[in-house]
């Protein structure tokens, strides 16, 4: 599955990696997949997607998928961002 996803699906034409990453994060937020959000929020940051863009995506998703998943995702994003800031400072 991982080989297929990252070797095939993520390489298909039509979307840039940053777009795929943001879409994936939105799906994970909408479906409440907190564990996977950690990995993909890290990946999004590594691709240069800003915290502000991810926060805006979470707010947008909240209007369609509900505020409880958005609040949870906001917490997860803060945890990931803070951890990455600490990693880069050391």
Which sequence ranges carry the predicted segments?
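Acidic, glycine/proline-rich low-complexity segments that act as flexible tails and inter-domain linkers
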Residues: 1-18, 46, 69-90
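Short alpha-helix boundary/capping elements
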Residues: 5, 27-34, 65-66
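Short, structured motif recognition centered on aromatic/hydrophobic residues
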Residues: 19-28, 57-58
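Extended intrinsically disordered, low-complexity coil regions enriched in Ser, Thr, Gly, Ala
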Residues: 33-55, 70-81
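Short secondary-structure capping/turn micro-motifs that flank functional sites
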Residues: 60-61, 78
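C-terminal structural segments of small proteins and small subunits
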Residues: 62-70
């Amino acid at each position: 599955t991982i080989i297929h996803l990252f070797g095939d699906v993520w390489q298909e034409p039509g979307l840039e990696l940053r777009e795929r990453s943001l879409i994936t994060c939105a799906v994970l937020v909408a479906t409440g997949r907190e564990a996977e959000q950690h990995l993909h929020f890290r990946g999004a940051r590594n691709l240069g997607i800003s915290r502000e863009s991810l926060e805006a995506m979470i707010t947008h998703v909240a209007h369609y998928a509900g505020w409880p998943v958005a609040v949870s995702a906001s917490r997860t994003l803060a945890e990931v961002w803070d951890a990455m800031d600490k990693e880069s400072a050391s």
